[in-house]
From Swiss-Prot:
Site (May be catalytically important): C153
Keyword Hydrolase attributed: yes
GO biological processes: tetrahydrofolate biosynthetic process
Pathway: Cofactor biosynthesis; 7,8-dihydroneopterin triphosphate biosynthesis; 7,8-dihydroneopterin triphosphate from GTP: step 1/1
SS bond partners: none
Role summary: Converts GTP to 7,8-dihydroneopterin triphosphate.
Organism: Cupriavidus metallidurans (strain ATCC 43123 / DSM 2839 / NBRC 102507 / CH34) (Ralstonia metallidurans)
Gene behind the chain: folE2-2
Molecular function GO terms recorded: GTP cyclohydrolase I activity
Entries under InterPro entries matching the protein: GTP_cyclohydrolase_FolE2, GTP_cyclohydrolase_FolE2/MptA
Organism taxonomic ancestry: Bacteria, Pseudomonadati, Pseudomonadota, Betaproteobacteria, Burkholderiales
Protein name: GTP cyclohydrolase FolE2 2
Enzyme Commission no: 3.5.4.16
The entry's keywords: Hydrolase
Length: 267
């Protein structure tokens, strides 16, 4: 094993001057999987996050300090909420000596759901992404949730003597936040406006309820995005959003799709 002479100073190549004089808007690490503890209404919950972390690199600096991104995660293992996430990106800018940066973390989020008739409980998973962007002295916060629901076609119901085609749909909401909003509140906005929500475990009486609930509440993909948009528009914690609905049509080999984008600052 080679011993390092304590008098030897290892060169810091990353901090050397770059003569090409080209700014790099975003440089960092991508796809870092790390244990993650979330602060939720039910308490601390463990999951696994996939992190993308980057900073702006000045034109005269050769490289960023890649190891500091992972060190930041290792040294910040406390339960995460929006305030802690905002502080994390601020800490990253200090450590990387940067004036702009971005952290994105995606993770599965599980909610305990109670079946509508039998009362049996089960977990249902949702795909969630948090983003904190720091630039020009301001930090913007974003939350994305993909919510699976059931949709039932109003046209199919209207023209058929019995039954109607229905399918699973994905509602994806990417919201820019002006205040604290927990994941479960965002999920509820989508589930409550769908033909019916989903559960991980259902008994026969529950299946009857779900079937009839969807039949009594038919919605086109256009209805889904418009009804959810009404909820997002009325929530002062949300300043802007992109809302997508995709119905995986049971009678076609393609999806029905709709998008609404809205920024309340530019009404």
């Amino acid at each position: 094993m080679n011993d390092i002479n304590p008098a030897f100073v290892m060169p810091d190549v990353q901090s050397s001057v770059d003569t090409r004089q080209i700014v790099i808007q975003r440089v960092g690490v991508k796809g870092v999987r790390y244990p993650l503890t979330l602060k939720t209404p039910a308490g601390a919950v463990g999951t696994v996050g996939t992190f993308n972390m980057d900073v702006r690199l000045p034109a005269d600096q050769k490289g960023t300090h890649m190891s500091r991104f992972v060190a930041l995660l290792e040294e910040n293992r406390a339960p995460l909420d929006l305030a802690a996430f905002r502080a994390l990106v601020d800490d990253m800018l200090v450590r990387l000596e940067a004036d702009a940066g971005r952290i994105e973390v995606s993770f599965p989020y599980f909610i305990t759901k109670t079946a509508p008739v039998s009362g049996v409980q089960s977990l249902l998973d949702y795909e969630v992404t948090l983003v904190a962007e720091a630039r020009d002295g301001q930090t913007r916060m974003f939350m994305t949730a993909l919510v699976p629901v059931t949709s039932l076609c109003p046209c199919s119901k209207k023209i058929s003597q019995y039954g109607a085609h229905n399918q699973r749909s994905h509602i994806t909401m990417r919201v820019e936040l002006a205040g604290d909003l927990d994941v479960e509140a965002l999920v509820r906005m989508a589930e409550e406006e769908a033909s019916c929500e989903l559960w991980g475990l259902l008994k026969r009486p529950d299946e009857k309820f779900v079937t009839e609930r969807a039949y009594e509440n038919p919605k086109f993909v256009e209805d889904l995005v418009r009804d959810i948009a009404m909820r997002l528009n009325a929530d002062d914690r949300i300043v802007a959003y992109t809302l997508e609905a995709e119905n995986f049509e049971s009678i076609h080999n393609h999806s029905a799709y709709a998008v609404i984008e809205h920024d309340k600052r530019h009404q």
